[in-house]
Amino acid sequence: MDIFGVLSLIGGLAIFLYGMDLLGEGLTGASGGKLEKILEKLTSNPLKAVLLGAGVTAVIQSSSATTVMVVGFVNSGIMKLSQAVGVIMGANIGTTITSWILSLTGIESSNIFISLLKPTSFSPVLAAVGIVFLMFLKKDSLKNPGKIMIGFALLMYGMDAMSSSVAPLAEVPQFASILTAFSNPVLGMLAGMLFTAIIQSSSASVGILQALCSTGILSYATALPIIMGQNIGTCVTALLSSIGATKNGKRAAIIHLYFNVIGTVTFMIVFYALNAVIHFSFLNLTAQEFGIAVIHTAFNIITTAYLLPLRKVLEKLAYATIKLDDDEKRIMDSRSGNEFALLDDRFLEAPSLAVEHCKQVINKMADISRESLFISMSLIGGYDEEQALRVGELETRADKYEDALGTYIMKISTKNLKKEDSEMLNVMLHCIGDFERISDHACNLCDSARELQQKNMQFSPKAETELDILSSAVREAVDISFDAFKSNNKNEADKVEPLEELIDTLAVELKARHIRRLREGKCTIELGFAHSDILNNLERVADHCSNIAVDVIQSDQLEFDAHEYLDRIKNKDNQQFARDYKTYKEKYRLPETRSFK
């Protein structure tokens, strides 16, 4: 094998790996990220966990990626460690789908119809059609099939290139000697483990082994222990991803390692013990692509079958290796100790899932802002220091949420996103600022309430009634806009602007009335300043509610002018706006109406 053969092998491996990645990307895109979301909501049924782990891995074409995702789920507390065991086992089964696809390259027949099943016969056509889909179609839903076709074609082309490059090795005696040495179970297992750990893909490692079948000197006696070692080598990716994870996240990676090590060692002990008695004749046969796929699948199904009932033992081993300390127990029991666990970098490899997690976290942020605002509004009528401290705590949390979400959204935005995910990400990026500012205004209202209490000032009954009416309108604006954001309901979002317009009108009227009371000597200047601050903050809250509603409405529009939209809906010819405004005007009518229009 000369230098050109080595370069051909490296090039074939590169194309093979890229094809596998593109195929997985297309399949993941076609699934719409639904499998990852189902995986997140996994039930405790172990058989379902295995099947789901196998299904997800078959789609994304990587057991390592599935296991890394599981580490992330366990790390964030979404998935219990006991649930993770079944998924990890299923991932080992799902990864064998690649070897079955590659086994098609071994089809040999003079029958034209059977020959058409060989990938080299139809891969060029798939590649051509895939390029058309990818380059000339704009919808992501149509581009994904293109990625699948091109990925499959590249996978086959890479496999063919590797097979062609290693075929001359059949004439090299030294290579035959190396393969013979690897028929030693321990050496073969170590070789498979080391190579897979380096390239971090058991599917690619098995694919290269299938490519070696073209030499005609690879026997099943050599292939079998190498396949066993490949299953251990693939654990490296999950172990690396667990660095920096919580102890529970590390335990998930350890379970993956224990499952593969125990499964491999016990399988090899039993198999070679039986071989000493029965003498399996197939071991001396020349290995074929199809046979390697069978061994790879059978091994993973058998090990899963006898270790699944022992899943509790694997869990205990993980806890014995990484012990549960007092600090971890305290964190697990804490309600707020893991607020941003969903924003785990491991989920960035499944962008749709990462976007969904962002939405869940920002919904919590919205609840925090709403709670802080409603508490502060209640303090104006009756100040309570404990509740005021609560507002400060909530505002601090809202600031942390803004920082964490902003950073994570920026990370997601660098990924290849679906159109709807990109739109949702844009809405969230705009809205986190509004949610944070609302919590700031809540603190301002709290300060005004504290000032009233410290200076022993009190509004007149009429002023209190007017503020209660305005506060009720603001509460409804907050409820409608926040709920519209959570449900992405554009019809609900449309109701915010008429209410915000009314709130502005009410604020102007309340200021005018208060000035009149000042002139009549019914109110002090100092109390007037506090009244003005409260009105300004309530008005600003309504403005942020309007911003949130507009973001929801424009979420699926590439070109959207917010100012043009607001001018259009406020137009006197907009009957729906006029009807909604009239409804709110009746609902929040002030006691005195002589100057209110």
Predicted segments — roles?
Residues 79, 105, 218, 244-250, ...:
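Cytosolic, long alpha-helical scaffolding segments
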Residues 69-91, 99-121, 196-233, 242-248, ...:
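Membrane-interfacial helix-loop connectors
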Residues 1-7, 109-121, 175-180, 221, ...:
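Interfacial loop-to-helix junctions that mark the boundaries of transmembrane helices
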Residues 8-21, 53-57, 125-137, 150-162, ...:
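Hydrophobic core segments of alpha-helical transmembrane domains in multi-pass membrane transport
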Residues 1-46, 145-194, 212-215:
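Helix-loop-helix hairpins and the membrane-proximal interhelical loops
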Residues 33, 37, 41, 45, ...:
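Alpha-helical transmembrane segments of multi-pass membrane proteins, especially transporters
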Residues 59-66, 85-102, 119-126, 155, ...:
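Membrane-embedded alpha-helical segments of transport systems
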Residues 24-28, 57-65, 166-167, 195-204, ...:
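Short helix-coil transition sites and intra-membrane helix breaks within transmembrane domains
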